[in-house]
A protein has these predicted regions:
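GST-like domain detector, emphasizing the conserved glutathione-binding G-site
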Residues: 1-134
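Amphipathic alpha-helical segments that form well-ordered structural scaffolds
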Residues: 26-29, 70, 164-175, 226
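Structured helix-beta-strand junction loops
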Residues: 30, 178-179, 230
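GST-like fold's C-terminal all-alpha helical module
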Residues: 104-219
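Intrinsically disordered, low-complexity polar regions and short flexible loop motifs
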Residues: 219-226
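C-terminal helix/juxtamembrane-tail motif
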Residues: 227-237
Length: 237
């Protein structure tokens, strides 16, 4: 049995972390049975101090991309089946854009804006004892702000960050065009990543120009609905 460790639902999302959402999609895309563990204690036991990770018959695999590699190697499932070399390369580049660029812009919106933090990320800490909860929240948010600054995007003003986010959404929208999924009628590996991130960007309760930018692109909105309907038909947070 496979166990996937994550944070759990919030903001109308099946899972608040786009990386954990990606892992859910990968497992479901591969048709593998698994159970989800959203106990916060799993975070403190994470091999690299981050979620997601899986436990598969005693073997622990952390990081959503390495979870994908594990599925491909152990279960023989090709997430890019039928794609050309150029499409595979495009998919990989798009995944890196989502995970190394768009992710940080979403961190800014979710974690550093007080209203959005209360609507979503704060729920991660709900199981902590009340006396220490605000202290831990404040520490984590300071860490996020410092990391965003070190990463580079935190050095830009809000207008510049929004312009960069718009470029990411335009790229996703352009590749998607009028297709159901990024590369055609069926989802592939890149859809697990891009799908997870745009689903997260359109989360309920988020008030931000970044969300408005994504919502202004009709094919992205339809894509979110399609991903949610296919992989999370009974979701809710």
């Amino acid at each position: 049995m496979i166990t996937l460790y994550g944070f759990g639902p919030a903001m109308g999302l099946p899972e608040i972390s786009p990386f954990v959402t990606k892992a859910h999609i990968l497992l479901r895309m591969a048709g593998l049975s698994y159970e989800a563990d959203t106990n916060l204690g799993a975070f403190f036991k994470a091999p690299r101090g981050k979620l997601p990770y899986i436990r598969d018959d005693g073997e622990v695999v952390s990081d959503s991309t390495f979870i994908r590699f594990h599925i491909e190697k152990k279960y023989g499932f090709d997430f890019d089946r039928g794609l050309s070399a150029a499409e595979r390369a495009t998919g990989w580049a798009l995944e890196r854009m989502c995970e190394e660029h768009l992710y940080w812009l979403m961190i800014d919106v979710r974690w550093l804006d007080d209203r959005n933090f209360r609507a979503g990320p704060s729920k991660i800490f709900a199981s902590l004892p009340a006396p220490v909860r605000p202290l831990i929240e404040a520490y984590v948010r300071r860490t996020m702000r410092r990391t965003l600054h070190l990463q580079g995007l935190g050095r830009h003003d809000p207008a510049a960050r929004l312009e960069l986010a718009k470029r990411d959404f335009v790229a996703i929208s352009g590749i998607l065009a009028d297709k159901p999924y990024l590369f055609g009628a069926e989802p592939h590996g890149a859809d697990a990543t891009a799908g997870a991130f745009v689903v997260g960007a359109l989360a309920e309760g988020v008030v931000a120009p970044l969300r408005d930018a994504a919502c202004s692109m009709s094919n992205i909105v339809a894509y979110v609905e399609r991903i949610t309907r296919r992989f999370f038909p009974t979701s809710g947070g």
